Amino acid sequence: MIENKFNNTILNSNSSTHDKISETKKLFGLWIYLMSDCIMFAVLFAVYAIVSSNISINLISNKIFNLSSILLETFLLLLSSLSCGFVVIAMNQKRIKMIYSFLTITFIFGLIFLLMEVHEFYELIIENFGPDKNAFFSIFFTLVATHGVHIFFGLILILSILYQIKKLGLTNSIRTRILCFSVFWHFLDIIWICVFTFVYLNGAI
């Protein structure tokens, strides 16, 4: 009996160590991916800066963009970041219902943000300010749409996490996925703050 308990202790210890190593590898892989994303967005921002500096008219402040709507989008995304933070807190407390609630709130805010962004694109296109208008709108659509695509995949990730929790419970693997999602979502918030400041706010001045 003592030998069995000793063996079980060793197995549990090995399992815990394996989970920690797996979590570390996944988080490290995520950071590598985010670094590549940073490079991609840095290139897009650089191209935008070059193009916008070579146009004679300030298109952002020329009443083409609805800045109040952009401000609301930013507020919604910041709220989603806050609710995402509460997801991690609830996870650490092993409160599955709270995880569900805050993930759902994060999803709703993110979805509204994405729909508003799509609506903005639609309004620009029907007013003949699409990506084929000139170089400025081409890089503008590329930059903002690239962020929007990331938001879209983030929403899919939320749905997959909700499904996995329902089927498997709060396993160590799912905890790692939640941590990875949280880092990814906060990264997207930071990128959007840069877009809002560098593109919209700076252009409106």
Curated annotation (Swiss-Prot):
SUPFAM superfamilies reported for this sequence: Cytochrome c oxidase subunit III-like
Topology in membrane: Multi-pass membrane protein
Organism in which the protein naturally occurs: Buchnera aphidicola subsp. Acyrthosiphon pisum (strain APS)
Function of the molecule: Cytochrome bo(3) ubiquinol terminal oxidase is the component of the aerobic respiratory chain of E.coli that predominates when cells are grown at high aeration. Has proton pump activity across the membrane in addition to electron transfer, pumping 2 protons/electron.
Name under which the protein is recorded: Cytochrome bo(3) ubiquinol oxidase subunit 3
NCBIfam families referenced in this protein's UniProt entry, alphabetically: CyoC (TIGR02842)
InterPro entries (alphabetical): Cyt_c/ubiquinol_Oxase_su3 (IPR024791), Cyt_c_oxidase-like_su3 (IPR000298), Cyt_c_oxidase_su3-like_sf (IPR035973), Cyt_c_oxidase_su3_a-hlx (IPR013833), Cyt_c_ubiqinol_oxidase_su3 (IPR014206)
Subunit structure: Heterooctamer of two A chains, two B chains, two C chains and two D chains.
PROSITE patterns attached to this UniProt entry: COX3
Cytoplasmic side: 1-26, 91-97, 160-177
Biological process terms in GO annotation: aerobic electron transport chain
MF terms in GO: cytochrome bo3 ubiquinol oxidase activity; cytochrome-c oxidase activity
Gene3D superfamilies tied to this protein: Cytochrome c oxidase, subunit III, four-helix bundle
Family: Belongs to the cytochrome c oxidase subunit 3 family.
